[in-house]
Curated annotation (Swiss-Prot):
The record marks 22, 26 as: Important for inositol polyphosphate binding. Residues 260-269, 336-338, 397-401, 492-503 are extracellular. Residues 435-639 form the EXS domain. PROSITE patterns: EXS, SPX. Belongs to the SYG1 (TC 2.A.94) family. Its main location: membrane. Residues 660-692 are annotated as: Disordered. This is Xenotropic and polytropic retrovirus receptor 1 homolog. Plays a role in phosphate homeostasis. Mediates phosphate export from the cell. Binds inositol hexakisphosphate (Ins6P) and similar inositol polyphosphates, such as 5-diphospho-inositol pentakisphosphate (5-InsP7); these are important intracellular signaling molecules. Keywords: Cell membrane, Membrane, Transmembrane, Transmembrane helix. It holds the Pfam family SPX. The gene is xpr1.
């Protein structure tokens, strides 16, 4: 593998700009070689002056790159040292509290037997668990910094060697010895010391001396490109996709043969939600593949465990497996008409299997990922009671595009409860008009508003935490338009069914709020979620200054499809109002539902790209995990103090507060360090420990 490819595959994406610009140096050398005056048409002194001038410019550029790398490395090393001190203080506090609570072991054991764990014991257990996770993430950040150190040194060595080869000189090697090999980023070995200390602390203090267990916890995933999936996973993906296509064809043929002249809409509404969920999972697999290929660190953005998370192959496998179940269930439902089987049992079995797959408590079938999803769903539905993270509102946004699944679930419950004739085998294709598909009882309107309500209260919670009206209250206003839109749609539908004269008034109000909602969400998609239409876009017209995906056409096509699909409701309303054909509303909504899932699939690419670029701007490459983080009010107060012009002048007034809140930078003495002297952290001495 060429070093350019190796560098591209192994860099930390959020630090991309801080690495040596190896490709730019290569282009610089090749351009100098191509543009050099020929010795055949000019004198030797002119050629020497040309190369001397080029080398002066080349080494000046090398000095700038070296200074950039030294500065960034020193900053990240200082940050790592501060983080190490903080974690060790937290660990020491937790261990001290644990020792204090075990002063009376006999009484404690008896109390455990009677009352189980006390609140203090549960808190201590949770703190230790959080500390293990925090040290694991900190260790990952150290490995990333060590990798940064090694890649940049190798980059300088390679490019200076190439310089000497092209120019037939040894000045590149001399410059490397004189500058690179004595540079702080290369000579400073404190990163190795921090790595060793972290391994020792985790082994002795958190894993009771079991080094194998400690290193398994600290294991860092490969820093290169995504590792290939196991052969059996790839085989199963292909097998499931092949079976799905064959059975899907059989479903179409069976439906054409057995369902002619029957009212299939109850069955369609019941099975439609399952299909949309499978489509969503498959497209999410494509999202994951695209993010990995483009260098968008979705693992960090969603705060997943970098050592254990689902790849695109796993998502394809799950989607394929569920797709086969869906096809067999639908085929059995249709084919059951010819042999008098109870067709209405098939959907119950299908969704029962899906539910069991999700909540299965055994540690099988992607247990950690399923548990993460269940925990995230719980956080989404309890949004007002805790701080909202990116994964929380991302999932709530997905639910807004999957709202029809909730509506179909409501229809299914209503249909099975009130309309289904359980004694007939053809219960899902009866010709009776469905009341459950209307807004008559108001439940359907409430269900339709649930996803928008979740995002609405998330925005209010974020406003409470940050005290920033923009963007959070403005974003909440965007989701509130859905409430008006659904309300007027329900009023129009019920008044029209009862032939009330004011139905047209509600129809026009529905159209107005639908238009306002579509414009609102479209502008927010393009400007806020995707960060497009930046004034400083430069050559990336109508986009942003920096883009991740290789072709600008991707962005322009995404803008066009977002505009079209945001206003696709106009087709549905027009066709339904004109009543161009039978069941026009159901047909159009069934076509538009998968298209909305596709729109959200495209949205995901650019929403995470925008978040990734924000992380790049902050050079954030690992999760921020602390046992005792600042609460939202403290964080807001600190930000306000930092924004004040006289904040520095008046800092003496808060000296008492600072003294009580600040943390000593002296490392706490743990049992694993009992023979080591206390050492203060040195922030500005990254060049005083040369080791060449």
């Amino acid at each position: 593998m060429k070093f350019t490819e190796h560098l591209s595959a192994h860099i930390t994406p959020e630090w991309r700009k801080q690495y040596i610009q190896y490709e730019a140096f290569k282009e610089m050398l090749y351009a100098a070689q191509d543009q050099a005056p020929s010795i055949e048409v000019t004198d030797e002194d002119t050629v020497k002056r040309y190369y001397a001038k080029f080398e002066e410019k080349f080494f000046q550029t090398c000095e700038k790159e070296l200074a950039k790398i030294n500065t960034f490395y020193s900053e990240k090393l200082a940050e790592a040292q501060r983080r190490s001190a903080t974690l060790q203080n937290e660990l020491q506090s937790s261990l001290d509290a644990q020792r204090e609570s075990s002063v009376v072991p006999g009484l404690r054991q008896r109390r455990k037997a009677v009352f189980a764990l006390t609140h203090e014991e549960r808190v201590q257990h949770r703190n230790i668990k959080d500390l293990k996770l925090a040290f694991s993430e900190f260790y990952l950040s150290l490995i990333l910094l060590q990798n940064y150190q090694n890649l940049n040194f190798t980059g300088f060595r390679k490019i200076l060697k190439k310089h000497d080869k092209i120019l037939e000189t040894s000045r590149g090697a001399d410059w490397r010895v004189a500058h690179v090999e004595v540079a702080p980023f290369y000579t400073c070995k404190k990163i190795n010391q921090l790595i060793s200390e972290t391994e020792t602390v985790v082994t002795n203090e958190l894993e009771s001396g079991d080094r194998q267990k400690a290193m398994k916890r600290l294991r860092v995933p490969p820093l290169g490109a995504a590792q290939p999936a196991p052969a059996w996973t790839t085989f199963r993906v292909g097998l499931y996709c092949g079976i799905f296509m064959v059975v899907n064809l059989a479903v179409v043929m069976a439906g054409y043969h057995f369902l002619q002249g029957k009212n299939v809409w109850p069955m369609v509404r019941i099975y439609r939600g399952g299909f949309l969920l499978i489509e969503f999972l498959f497209l999410l697999g494509i999202n994951t593949y695209g993010w990995r290929q483009a260098g968008v660190n979705h693992v960090l953005i969603f705060e997943l465990n970098p050592r254990n998370n689902l790849s695109h192959q796993h998502l394809f496998e799950i989607a394929g497996f569920l797709g086969i179940l869906w096809c067999f269930s639908l085929f059995s439902c249709i084919f059951g008409l010819s042999i008098n089987l109870q067709m209405h049992l098939n959907p119950l079995i299908l969704y029962g299997i899906m539910l069991v797959f999700l909540v299965n408590p055994t540690k099988t079938f992607y247990y950690k990922s399923r548990f993460w999803l269940l925990k995230l769903l719980f956080r989404v539905f309890t949004a007002p009671f805790h701080k909202v993270g990116f994964a929380d509102f991302w999932l709530a946004d997905q639910l807004n595009s999957l709202a029809i699944i909730l509506m179909d679930l409501e229809f299914m419950i209503c249909f099975y409860s009130f309309e289904l004739n359980w004694g007939k085998s053809e219960g899902l294709v009866e010709s009776a008009k469905s009341v459950c598909n209307s807004y008559s009882y108001g439940v359907r309107a409430v269900v339709q508003c649930i996803p928008a309500w979740l995002r609405f209260i998330q925005c209010l919670r974020r406003y409470r935490d940050t005290k920033r009206a923009f963007p959070h209250l403005v974003n909440a206003g965007k989701y509130s338009t859905t409430f008006f839109m659904v309300t007027f749609a329900a009023l129009y539908s019920t008044h029209k069914e009862r032939n009330h004269s004011d139905a047209q008034v509600f129809f026009y109000l529905w159209i107005v709020f639908y238009f306002i909602s579509s414009c609102y969400t479209l502008i927010w998609d393009l400007k806020m979620d995707w960060g497009l239409f930046d004034r400083n876009a430069g050559e990336n017209t109508f986009l942003r200054e920096e883009i991740v995906y290789p072709q600008k056409a991707y962005y322009y096509c995404a803008i066009i499809q977002d505009v079209i699909l945001r206003f696709a409701w106009t087709i549905q309303i027009s066709v339904t109002s004109l009543n161009l054909f039978t069941d026009a509303g159901d047909v159009i909504s069934t076509v538009l539902a998968p298209l909305e899932v596709f729109r959200r699939f495209v949205w995901n690419f650019f929403r995470l790209e925008n978040e990734h670029l924000n992380n790049c701007g902050e050079f954030r490459a690992v999760r921020d995990i602390s046992v005792a983080p600042l609460n939202a009010d403290d964080q807001t107060m600190l930000e306000q103090m930092m924004d004040q012009d006289d904040g520095v002048k008046n800092r003496v007034k808060s000296r008492i507060w600072k003294r009580s809140q600040s943390m000593s930078l002296r490392r706490p003495r743990l049992s694993s360090q009992s023979k080591m002297k206390d050492a203060k952290i040195l922030i500005d001495d990254t060049d005083d420990e040369a080791n060449t």
